[in-house]
Structures are given as structure tokens and as C-alpha cells.
Regions:
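Glycine-rich FAD pyrophosphate-binding loop
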Residues: 20-42
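Hydrophobic anchor at the start of a short beta-strand
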Residues: 6, 28-29, 142
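Predominantly flavin-linked oxidoreductase catalytic cores and closely associated redox partners
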Residues: 11, 104-233, 250, 266
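C-terminal helical "tail/cap" subdomain of flavin- and related membrane-associated enzymes
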Residues: 288-363
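Beta1/beta-strand and adjacent pyrophosphate-binding region of the FAD-binding site
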Residues: 1-14
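Generic enzyme active-site microenvironment
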Residues: 31, 144, 261
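FAD/FMN-dependent oxidoreductases across multiple families
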Residues: 120, 214-289, 294-295
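A conserved beta-strand/loop capping segment in the N-terminal third of enzymes
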Residues: 49-100
């Protein structure tokens, strides 16, 4: 039976972040992934400034747009520019971003195996054994970075699929667009959520996001309608729907030698569905706990608690925002626009921006 120090199931942003740090420290790391074979994983690909600061290596080679201004609208009307003095987001194409991170993790010493199915798991005193495509692999630790519907959470902790939020996206070639948009958020484009337009040079990433508690619906027809309304064409390719894990404030994150990170841990921010920051952060924190070698599960839970507290505070904000959109958009537009954008450009989270600028003179 093959034996390694750490198995990381999932070679996306969370998994690669963990694998990079672990392998850089000299541990033997095996990444297992199915999406890496196809090269496309659903994700809008926006890397916020707070996320960019976490990476151990430059992202320049995969940056398609640098964003310091975006448009926000209510029901596709009342378009309002939101501007920061410095860039607050980098637009990447997710397959290219993932490939860069996999390459960096492998250069650090991690190995990658493309798999079809993780079907079994059991733990023992010195580690875990994972059954993958009918074969067993042993490790001292297991990191589940395989998404909101991932196998590791179900096998190690039980419970079925969870739906904190849903999104659907597609790519529209620039030649099919009647205009090339700025980065755009259209609140109310779908009930209980928003539509987005993320320009990427040769194409625009078009998507819809909803919080599932609101009863809204996203599907191919809704996405095609939105693309026609905003860009004059529904010639979308690579259309994919996907669940987002937004339950990290109450998810069981670790037990013994198993740690959950990224969407598998529910670390996506629920207001806008931004998941890359929580993914990279949790992957790095999981690696740090393993490298410290003490009470790994307890150390990881304690170390990631600040982000869990952020998520806990954002949930009621998101609920109020989407259920009172005409009022909340007005507050966003006339009240917190400037401090929010300044905070994001300085790498702050939503709650940190609120704390820093509470009582400031708003634009």
C-alpha cells in the first residue's frame, strides 16, 4: 500500500494552497483530483486583493484584467460605478489559475494523481487509509478540499449534500458580445441573488448567484436570458451549475487526522459567493496545523476561527441585503460605497471594512 505524509483530495485553490506549504516544508504530499483532467472547474475567477496577498507566488502570468472600477445595478437599472484608488480584484480564468497553482505545488514537491472516485475511508491510531478507484492509500493526515459535495466530508463526518448557495456560469466569446462590459454586479437579476459580468479579454464570464434560502432559481434558461439582456447573445459555452459552501460558521471542520478546507468546509462568503480567499486561507491554515505537529485538529479550528467569525457575521447581512434590495442597494450606493471599496482595495474583508470605517463620513 502506498504511504505518504498527507493526502489532499482536491487540487483546486484550497488543496493546492495546503499542498504547496506542506511540500515546501519537506512532507510527502499526494494530491488527488478529477477536475484537473478536464482543466475546467466552475468559478468566476475573481481574485480579490485580500486573496492575492495570501499567495506564496506571483499571479501575473494568469491575470487577464486588473479591476479598480466596477458597475453595480439594481434590477439592471440605476447603474452605479464603484471605484477604488487602487485595484481591488484581479480577473483570472479559473483553469489557468488552477494550473498555475498545481504547477507551483508540484514544483514544491507535491505529486498529483487524476482519479475518478474516492469510495472509502477509515482511520487508525497512526493515520488514515483512503480507498481510491479500488486501491488503498495510507497517510498520516487527510485534507478534504473536494468542494461542497465532496466525498471526504461525507465519508469522514457523515451527512448528505448541502446547499448554502448556488451559481451557474458560462463563457461568452467577446466576438459575440454587443459590448465589452466592465466588471458588473446586477443585484436582483435573479430572485435572492445577482448576475455578474466578468470580462476576461477574449471572453466574458457570465453568471447568476443565489442564496438557496431565498427560493430563487438559477438554470440554463435564466442564464441565457441574462446574457441576451446584458450582452445581446446567448451563445454561451462551458455552462456549468455548481453548489457553494457557505456553512463554514457551523460546519464540523476537523476530527483526528482529517481536516476540511475551502468549499468542503463551507468557507465561501455568503453575500457575493466569493470563495477563493476562504479556500487559500483555510488550505494554508490546515498545512500550518499539520506542520506544527501538536493537536492538529484543535490547532486548525482555533487558527481558522477568525474567518468563521467573519462568516457568522456576514450571514445576517446577506439575508437582510437580498430580502430588502431596494433599501439595501440604496444604502450600498449612497452610504457605504466609498469605505467599502477602499477597504477591499486595502485587502480587508467586509466585516473589517465595516469596523475600520464605522462612523466615517460616507460618500
Amino acid at each position: 500500500m502506498k504511504q505518504v505524509d498527507v493526502i489532499v483530495v482536491g487540487a483546486g485553490q484550497a488543496g493546492c494552497a495546503a499542498a504547496y506549504d506542506l511540500a515546501s516544508a519537506g512532507l510527502s504530499v499526494l494530491m488527488l483530483d478529477s477536475h484537473a483532467a478536464t482543466g475546467h472547474k466552475p468559478c468566476a475567477g475573481g481574485v480579490t486583493e485580500k486573496a492575492r496577498r495570501l499567495y506564496r507566488f506571483p499571479l501575473d502570468s494568469v491575470v487577464r484584467e486588473t479591476v479598480s472600477q466596477m458597475q453595480m445595478s439594481l434590477y439592471q437599472k440605476l447603474e452605479t460605478p464603484f471605484t477604488a484608488d487602487t485595484p481591488f480584484c484581479l480577473m483570472t480564468h479559473r483553469p489557468e489559475l488552477d494550473q498555475l497553482c498545481r504547477d507551483q505545488a508540484q514544483q514544491a514537491g507535491a505529486s498529483l494523481t487524476i482519479v475518478r472516485h474516492v469510495s472509502g475511508f477509515h482511520s487508525h491510531g497512526d493515520g488514515i487509509v483512503l480507498t481510491v478507484d479500488g486501491e488503498q492509500i495510507g497517510a498520516r493526515y487527510l485534507i478534504g478540499a473536494d468542494g461542497a459535495h465532496g466525498a471526504v466530508r461525507r465519508l469522514a463526518f457523515g451527512g448528505g449534500a448541502r446547499h448554502g448557495a448556488m451559481a451557474i456560469e458560462g463563457l461568452l466569446s467577446r466576438e459575440h458580445c454587443n459590448r465589452y462590459p466592465q466588471t458588473t454586479f446586477d443585484f436582483g437579476a435573479v430572485r435572492g441573488g445577482y448576475g455578474w459580468l466578468f470580462p476576461k479579454g477574449d471572453h466574458v464570464n457570465v453568471g447568476l448567484y443565489i442564496r438557496t434560502q431565498t427560493g430563487g432559481k438559477v438554470d440554463r434558461h435564466a442564464l441565457a436570458d441574462y446574457a441576451r439582456q446584458r450582452l445581446g447573445s446567448d451563445a454561451l459555452t462551458h455552462v456549468q451549475g455548481f453548489p457553494l459552501g457557505t456553512w463554514g460558521h457551523k460546519q464540523r471542520l476537523a476530527a483526528g487526522r482529517v481536516l476540511l478546507v475551502g468549499d468542503a468546509a463551507g468557507f465561501t462568503e455568503p453575500l457575493l459567493g466569493e470563495g477563493i480567499y476562504g479556500a487559500v486561507l483555510s488550505g494554508q491554515r490546515a498545512a500550518a496545523a499539520i506542520l506544527a505537529g501538536n493537536d492538529v485538529a484543535a490547532d486548525y479550528i482555533a487558527d481558522i476561527d477568525r474567518w468563521r467569525s467573519e462568516l457568522r457575521r456576514v450571514h445576517p447581512i446577506a439575508a437582510i441585503f437580498y430580502t430588502t434590495l431596494p433599501i439595501s442597494f440604496g444604502v450600498l450606493k449612497h452610504g457605504v460605497r466609498r469605505p467599502l471599496m477602499t477597504g477591499y482595495a486595502n485587502g480587508l474583508t467586509l466585516v473589517q471594512s465595516k469596523r475600520l470605517f464605522f462612523g466615517a463620513r460616507f460618500q
